[in-house]
Amino acid sequence: MFRVKIISQKRTKSVQMLENDQLDILGQQPSLYKLYTQICSIYRVPDPSAHDHIVNTLTRGLETLAKNFQWLAGNVVNEGADEGNTGTYRIVPSDKIPLIVQDLREDLSAPTMDSLEKADFPIYMLDEKTFAPCMTINPPGNTIGMAAKSGPVFAVQANFISGGLVLTIVGQHNIMDITGQESIINLLNKSCHQKPFSDEELLIGNIDKSKSIPLFDETWEPDTTLVHEIVETSRNTSGEEKEQSCSSNSTWAYVEFSAISLQNLRILAMQTCTSGTKFVSTDDIVTAFIWKSVSRARLSRLKPETKSNLGRAVDVRKRLGLPETYPGLLVNMTFNTGSLKSLDHKSLGVLASQIRRKLDPKVFDLAYNTCALATLLSRCPDKTKVSIPQPIDTLSGIMVSSWAKVSLYDVDFNLGLGKPKSVRRPRFISLESLIYFMPRSSRGEMVVALCLRDKDWECLNADKEWTNYATHIG
């Protein structure tokens, strides 16, 4: 097994802000530039007179956050790009972290808190164009949101609706993953409570991100562990695939697995787990159940022998010896493969065990793979040649990112509103086969956002095995 040697950093009496304006090496991927992770915390506001207090508290909190972590108030820019060279992304300073305040109480197109709560906070009622300061994806020519003109590292939008507040926080993905964003949100929560930051928080929060992943020396050569990350210059696509891809109509929707459903899925999975499997997580089991169910739905339009890939995002902080609160981008992917027919026939326990096995360092060393990927990126002038991951075939595969362990239901930002009633990702453009597990509340349920073809949704919603465990929210 590959081991990473971690060199401890000495504490300094004062933190020098923006001494290093570099990103994690993984953040140098052009595909992550102006790609934003959005998360909404939704609170009930009984009294509109609290609006001024809410805005003032957020304003002071963001000012304190920017003063102590100046890079959060910056913008990401690209420099030195030309033909065959994607250049370098770095952070340039700005004067403050953006806060947008929007009053939608008189907007008839905006939902009310009562309507949101009655519908169980569906994704179709939470569109990014209304509720987010930056769109998820911002291609050249985009005219919507702040990222149309700049590339803020971090931004907040407070949306007042009738009876509630939709507080949307976004982080640029080439700077931070969802775990890093959670760390920043917790720091903002602390600053809103006017509590001082500890020396450790200041140290970790201002760490030199460009040195977070150790690189191999010049004797190292790329090997087969990077088969999923090296982008093919061309790919033969059949006429059938092109036709289906062009004609696809995909829709985002939330489904809920209640605490009882999760318990029953675990009982079912544990009956058939492979021998030698010491542990499978709830995430493993739900991922397996979704992959199995979606594959079964796709048998109505694809051949049984069609290969399906599962790409799963994995936080690698622990594997690289970095703090759990490290606020940067440290995520890699694991991959599993099977035919649609085999996935449908395979038992839940066997499939969950198979997915779990890819987290075993004896089977797949994520620490080595991450360092190898970072080394390859550092050597490559044109970083479009390397990607985490090379795109999965969305006709048959799925990509899963779990935010289930992101603890946001206890964050109140000192707004006087108590805990959020719901935490959701707003709706953005349809990206077929992309799946997000939402943060879990104290009630124990798991809400999952899936983007699937309408035909696949029809098959799923008519599948008794699926509906026995998953409740459609929309």
Swiss-Prot record:
Its EC number is 2.3.1.-. One of its GO terms (biological process) is mycotoxin catabolic process. GO terms for cellular component: cytoplasm; peroxisome. It holds the Pfam family TRI-like_N. Keywords: Acyltransferase, Transferase. GO terms for molecular function: acyltransferase activity, transferring groups other than amino-acyl groups; trichothecene 3-O-acetyltransferase activity. Trichothecene 3-O-acetyltransferase involved in self-protection against trichothecenes, mycotoxins acting as eukaryotic protein synthesis inhibitors. Its existence is surprising in a non-trichothecene producer organism which needs no self-protection again endogenic trichothecenes. The persistence of this non-essential gene may be due to a selective advantage that it may confer, like a resistance to exogenic trichothecenes. Belongs to the trichothecene 3-O-acetyltransferase family. This is Trichothecene 3-O-acetyltransferase.
